[in-house]
C-alpha cells in the first residue's frame, strides 16, 4: 500500500483519521499513528492551550508521525498556528478557508500541508496555493460539507483530472473495499472520519457512539444549507432546524438557532435530543465498537482480500 501519500507523511498505510471536533484527541490520533496510519488532532473544538496539551500527550504516546486538522475560520487561528509551530508539528490539514493564507507560511516552517475541498474548482485553487496534498471530500461525509453536494464517487475522478498532487479521498469510506474503490477512482489515500469516531479511543460520548452504531440508511441528512451545510442524525434539534429552514430562516437566524456548543452537547456530552449529532452516511454500515488497532487490521485485511478478488475477476 506504499505510495506518494505514504512517502509524503512517513506512514505505513495511506489511511488518515479525520480530525473531527469532539472526537479526535490525543488518544485517538496516537492510536491511529501507532497502527500505521496518520492520526490527526481536531483543533476545531480545542482552545489553543488545550491543543498544546494534546500535541504534547500525543508525542508522549507515539513516535510515529501525526498531525493537526485546523479549520481556517477558527477565531484564534493565529494563536493555533503559533502553537503548532512552537510544538514542532510536521503535518497540518486545513479546511474551511483560503489555502493561500497559510500554506506557504507553514511550509517555510517545514510543515507538510493538505487542504480539504468539496469541488474540482477549489482543488485547482489548492494546487495553485502549493499544497502538498488535497483531500477531496464527498457529501456523504459527516459534519460540515460543501454546497455542491457532490458524491465521493463523482468528485474523485473530477479532481484527479485537474490536479497532480497526491489525492486523498474522503466521505463514505469505512471499509477496505472502500479504500480499493477510492484508489480505482484515482486517489492515493483515504481520510476516514466516521469509522474512527466510532472507536473506543475516540473522545466522543458513549451515547453518541451507541446511537451511530444503530443507524439505518437515511438516518442522516444534510441540513443548515442556508448557513453551513452539515450532515446530522435526525433528532429533535435536526427537526428544529428543518422547520426553521422551511419557514425561510436567514443564515443569521439559523446561526442564532444553532447557538454555541450544540456539537459539544451532542457528540461530547451525549445529548441525543438537543445536541448536534454529526456523522457520515456510512455509519449505517457499522455495528460494532472496536479499538483502533482492530479497525486498522480489518481495513488492511479487507483491502487485500478485495484486491485479490478483483484481480481474479479480470477475465474480460
Model-found features: residue ranges?
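Conserved active-site-proximal phosphate/metal-binding subdomains
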Residues: 146-168, 174-316
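Active-site metal-binding loops of divalent metal-dependent hydrolases
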Residues: 20, 172-173
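Active-site entrance/lid segments in N-terminal catalytic domains of soluble metabolic enzymes
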Residues: 1-162
Amino acid at each position: 500500500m506504499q505510495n506518494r501519500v505514504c512517502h509524503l507523511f512517513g506512514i505505513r498505510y495511506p489511511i488518515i483519521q479525520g480530525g473531527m471536533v469532539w472526537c479526535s484527541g490525543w488518544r485517538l490520533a496516537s492510536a491511529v499513528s501507532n497502527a500505521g496510519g496518520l492520526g490527526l488532532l481536531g483543533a476545531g473544538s480545542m482552545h489553543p492551550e488545550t491543543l498544546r496539551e494534546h500535541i504534547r500527550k500525543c508525542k508522549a504516546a507515539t513516535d510515529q508521525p501525526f498531525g493537526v486538522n485546523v479549520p481556517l475560520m477558527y477565531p484564534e487561528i493565529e494563536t493555533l498556528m503559533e502553537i503548532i509551530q512552537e510544538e514542532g508539528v510536521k503535518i497540518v490539514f486545513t479546511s474551511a478557508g483560503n489555502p493561500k493564507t497559510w500554506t506557504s507560511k507553514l511550509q517555510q516552517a517545514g510543515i507538510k500541508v493538505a487542504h480539504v475541498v468539496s469541488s474540482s474548482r477549489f482543488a485547482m485553487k489548492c494546487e495553485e496555493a502549493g499544497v502538498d496534498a488535497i483531500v477531496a471530500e464527498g457529501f456523504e461525509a459527516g459534519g460540515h460539507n460543501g454546497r455542491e453536494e457532490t458524491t465521493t464517487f463523482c468528485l474523485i475522478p473530477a479532481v484527479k483530472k485537474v490536479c497532480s498532487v497526491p489525492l486523498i479521498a474522503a466521505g463514505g469510506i469505512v471499509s477496505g473495499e472502500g479504500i480499493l474503490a477510492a484508489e480505482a477512482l484515482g486517489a492515493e489515500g483515504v481520510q476516514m472520519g466516521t469509522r474512527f469516531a466510532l472507536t473506543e479511543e475516540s473522545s466522543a460520548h458513549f451515547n453518541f457512539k451507541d446511537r451511530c452504531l444503530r443507524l439505518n440508511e437515511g438516518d442522516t441528512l444534510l441540513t443548515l444549507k442556508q448557513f453551513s451545510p452539515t450532515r446530522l442524525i435526525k433528532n429533535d434539534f435536526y427537526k428544529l432546524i428543518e422547520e426553521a429552514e422551511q419557514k425561510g430562516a436567514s443564515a443569521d437566524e439559523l446561526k442564532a438557532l444553532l447557538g454555541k456548543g450544540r456539537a459539544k452537547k451532542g457528540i461530547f456530552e451525549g445529548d441525543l435530543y438537543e445536541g448536534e449529532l454529526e456523522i457520515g452516511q456510512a455509519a449505517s454500515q457499522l455495528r460494532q465498537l472496536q479499538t483502533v488497532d482492530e479497525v486498522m487490521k480489518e481495513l488492511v485485511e479487507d483491502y487485500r482480500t478485495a484486491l485479490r478478488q478483483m484481480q481474479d475477476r479480470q477475465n474480460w
